[in-house]
Design a protein with these regions (language model features):
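Conserved catalytic SET/PR domain of SAM-dependent protein methyltransferases, capturing the structural core
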Residues: 1-207
């Protein structure tokens, strides 16, 4: 019912895609309604990939730029759906956290399916407890992240998230090199740098 969707669902049309307000950034994600602090702006399922697959992809691939990773882990996480369209800002208006669908799945299963599962209803703790090989071989995107508003967002505002301090430092070095005489002669190499999840997001079994 509509009431169930309002209680348990998240509308894809709450956001929309258009040209970013950052010059040269390409597309960005924008609010299609007002959001209060703490509201979920959008959700991305997450695919788990081995780092060596990401880093040994074809030469002109920038897949690495769209993945989260930790220095001490061989696991890279690729958000699908709207996640890769959210640009970086040192002053973000959303923050990332793990999202747990199991309460919604269980509530809908109890109401409409006699308590039988309507889908993959592993609890968040179970998913985060999966080992790397389990995540790689899963037949579905086993993890989800939510982008939550950190303060009020108005309809039409661009959505920004922090890619982390390591990403910002790498970007600053890259843009500084691109302005040098030597760099202008040799050509502009492609920028590649993992994004970072908030500190403590990777469970110990992934590291």
């Amino acid at each position: 019912s509509v009431d169930d969707l309002r209680e348990h669902g998240h509308c894809l049309t709450d956001v929309r895609i258009r040209e970013s307000t950052i010059p040269g950034a390409g597309q960005g994600l924008f609010a299609n309604r007002d959001f209060l602090p703490g509201e979920v702006v959008t959700i991305s399922p997450v695919l788990a990939l081995p780092k060596n697959v990401v880093e040994n992809s074809v030469h002109d691939s920038v897949l690495k730029n769209y993945c989260f990773a930790e220095a001490d882990s061989d696991l890279a996480l690729f958000p699908i759906n709207y996640g890769p369209l959210i640009n970086h800002s040192p002053e973000p208006n959303v923050a990332i956290e793990w999202f747990d669908w199991s309460p919604a799945v269980n509530a809908m299963s109890a109401k409409y399916n006699g308590g039988q599962s309507l889908g993959h209803d592993l609890k968040q703790a179970d998913k985060l407890g999966m080992g790397a090989q389990e995540l790689y071989s899963a037949s579905f995107a086993p993890l989800d992240i939510a982008y939550k508003a950190t303060h009020s967002i108005k309809k039409g505002d661009e959505i920004f998230v922090s890619y982390g301090s390591a990403w910002q430092q790498a970007w600053d070095r890259y843009t500084a090199r691109s302005r040098s005489t030597e760099q202008q002669k040799s050509g502009r190499p492609m920028f590649r740098q993992y994004m970072a999840l908030p500190a403590g997001s990777y469970p110990r079994n992934w590291i």
